[in-house]
Amino acid sequence: MAIKSFQGKRIVKKRSSSNRLLVSDIMSYKLVLFTPDESIHDVMKKFIKFRVSGGPVVNSYGKLVGIISEADCMKEISDSRYFNMPILDKTVKHFMTNNVQTIDVSTSVFDAASLFFKTKKRRFPVINKDKLVGQISRKDIVIAALNMKSQTWR
């Protein structure tokens, strides 16, 4: 009888769902928030000051009501020049995106990456029980992928 292997029986650990890398593990918790009544001029100042290209818009109760981005501001700048109107008196509520797509904190990083790929969006607000708790960006996903070990690619 020949020896087939010098190794013993291979034991493969079954991965539990708790080992999955989740959005909550890599998202940003410190956010630059905007309000619907904030002026576009103030928003652009915040973009420069905090080096962000957009962020969530919340009402006085802290509920997510929209997203404002540099692209929204570019539209206002373009329109103001075309109509020869100042941009100082316009507010976020006139230019923000109202129907906001969100990601739940319990979503896996891979599902989030797939959503980023399908939608071409740069960031998503992260929700836990209908409450805004953070934000995840494409950059967060890329950083997480670079830090993963081969065993976590599931």
Where are these regions (language model features)?
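Tandem CBS (Cystathionine beta-synthase) repeat/Bateman regulatory domains
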Residues: 1-154
